Curated annotation (Swiss-Prot):
Record's keyword terms, sorted: Metal-binding, Nucleus, Repeat, Transcription, Transcription regulation, Ubl conjugation, Zinc, Zinc-finger
Binding positions (Zn(2+) 2): C58, C61, C81, H91
Binding site for Zn(2+) 1: C5, C8, C28, H33
Protein name: B-box zinc finger protein 20
Main location: nucleus
Cellular compartment(s): Nucleus
Spans through the membrane: none
Encoding gene per record: BBX20
Description of how the protein assembles with itself and partners: Interacts with MED25 and COP1.
Biased composition regions of type Low complexity, renumbered to the chain: 133-153
One annotated GO biological process: positive regulation of photomorphogenesis
InterPro entries: B-box_zinc_finger, CONSTANS-like_Bbox1, Znf_B-box
RNA-binding in keyword set: no
Purpose of the protein: Acts as a positive regulator of seedling photomorphogenesis. Plays a negative role in brassinosteroid responses.
Length: 242
């Protein structure tokens, strides 16, 4: 006696799935449980068909091969013992009895390869490999034009001239044009302010000279020179650090 597949009903079942509560053949098992990762985690037990010698014996007589299983009596019965027991009265006739196939189920779940995991890993590996972006590749000619342009060279010379002028060590002709253009820009942005006072080092300025005059409004402002004194104007007092 065989157990047929619960899906196709054409082949003999080889595994039993506890989650699906169904017996499946090999083909239907691969089709159902290799579909996704969740289905691949279902516990499946192998089914083994017994030989004639391994067939179970009747629990009543213990001599003949058992063919039925009674759910209420919790016993396997042969044909000769089943008839007199379940035909005795109306209560025993209502017992649920099932055909006994003798198929044994394995004690531990079987290990099956998970094709879905390998496919997912391959897909993940393909997803991680991204093609190089065309926009990230900059032609060498364009990069040379950017870094060797005349404007960048002029700007670097201007900064170099300002640094030398700040430390009072600039040459006579070095960066004069750049310093003049920046001075004009500062005079236009901050009208009435002297650029020499802004570029002069704070340590070289005394307290009396540390006053910047606004020619337009005839107002004087005190600038903090980095010493240990506060220089304020108006209602604030001139006090040293405590």
């Amino acid at each position: 006696m065989k157990i047929w597949c619960a899906v196709c009903d054409k082949e003999e079942a080889s595994v039993f799935c506890c989650a699906d509560e169904a017996a499946l053949c090999n083909g239907c098992d691969r089709h159902v449980h290799f579909a996704n990762k969740l289905a691949g985690k279902h516990l499946r037990f192998s089914l083994t068909s017994p030989t004639f010698k391994d067939a179970p014996l009747c629990d009543i007589c213990g001599e003949r091969r058992a063919l039925l299983f009674c759910q209420e009596d919790r016993a396997i019965l042969c044909r000769e013992c089943d008839i007199p027991i379940h035909q005795a009265n109306e209560h025993t006739k209502k017992h649920n009895r099932f055909l006994l196939t003798g198929v044994k189920i394995s004690a531990s779940p079987s290990a099956y390869p998970r094709a879905s995991n390998s496919n997912s890993a391959a897909a993940f590996g393909r997803a991680k490999t991204r093609p190089k972006s065309v926009s990230s590749e900059v032609p060498s000619s364009a990069s040379n034009e950017v870094f060797t342009s005349s404007s960048s060279t002029t700007t670097s010379n201007c900064y170099y001239g300002i640094e030398e002028n700040y430390h009072h060590v600039s040459d006579s002709g070095s960066g004069s044009g750049c310093t003049g253009s920046i001075s004009e820009y500062l005079m236009e942005t901050l009208p009435g302010w002297r650029v020499e006072d802004l570029l002069e080092h704070p340590s070289c300025v005394s307290y009396e000279d540390n006053i910047i005059t606004n020619n337009n409004n005839s107002e004087s402002y005190r600038v903090y020179d980095g010493s240990s004194q506060f220089h304020h104007q108006g209602f604030w007092d001139h006090k040293p650090f405590s």
